[in-house]
């Protein structure tokens, strides 16, 4: 039975009708594959947004934390002893150089001054009389010299007594803002006491002390020496200030000096800037951020942050659209962030196009349809003063 069925099947396959159907089916399959290949080859290149790289002069700055310190600080102390009779200032007010702050009881010192004045007059008269007698040799030269020395000593005692009387009027040693008084009327104060009577602080101008890692300072010096950076000017470096609440201080300052030694515990060097402070907005001890101009890079290239990707090793790269509209991945070397972009040292050149939109749709070697990117807005990219924070 099985042998008969098999023979019947073979006869059907070998029949002319079956032989005509098989080539037709194969032809339809081949035709279908060709249509799929034509559809695939007709797929348009993906759209990508590109940013055209440009080079331009860029002023580089560095943001350093710091604290304000007073331009001058003077502790008011008594130079004579006595009972404090009067306080002549309002706590927290502005005082001038030489303005009277306190009055110490002067009566004892005025009496000593009168006694010193009498002794001076007596010594002066004796010396002049001996001078006359010396001409007639009524007194010896030694007696005259002793009288003359006594006169000079009496004169010195008089001057000391006069100064002590002046010291009973305690004056402000500098101009500035005076703090609270640590003593009241009726208190006994002494010359050389440890506690000051008050403190006067000069707030205009005011210092800002910032610290910079020595490695960054050395790198800046090398960049200036090599010519990669140009000095911003021949005068003192300009510094701008940001307060702790994020607001900008309106008046610029100047960098005065850097410390001559490095802190061995932190590896940092202290820089001091001076700021005008006419409205007394800055007070000693405030935490601030100082923005220091480092120099000008004449052919700086900025790359938007969204154009940069990193591999598993952390190496940054960008997708570059070549002249034939094909793309390639290219490694770059980043230096620092500038606003919302990266300053790079190599990898791409001016005029090249890098992809910032549609990165996920590209692979190396494919053709793309490059249009101007809409997601690029380099904040403060090439402004005259660019806020750059060192890595």
From Swiss-Prot:
Lipidated positions per record (N-palmitoyl cysteine): 33
Residues with lipidation of kind S-diacylglycerol cysteine: 33
Pfam families cross-referenced by the UniProt entry: CusB_dom_1, HlyD_D23
Membrane topology (UniProt): Lipid-anchor
GO cellular component, one term: plasma membrane
Signal peptide location: 1-32
Compartment annotation: Cell inner membrane
GO biological process: response to antibiotic
SUPFAM superfamilies assigned: HlyD-like secretion proteins
Flavoprotein in keyword set: no
Main location (coarse class): membrane
One Gene Ontology MF term: transmembrane transporter activity
NCBIfam families cross-referenced by the UniProt entry: RND_mfp
Family stated for the protein in its record: Belongs to the membrane fusion protein (MFP) (TC 8.A.1) family.
Matches recorded under PANTHER family: ACRA/E-RELATED COMPONENT OF DRUG EFFLUX TRANSPORTER, MULTIDRUG EFFLUX PUMP SUBUNIT ACRA-RELATED
UniProt protein name: Toluene efflux pump periplasmic linker protein TtgG
Gene: ttgG
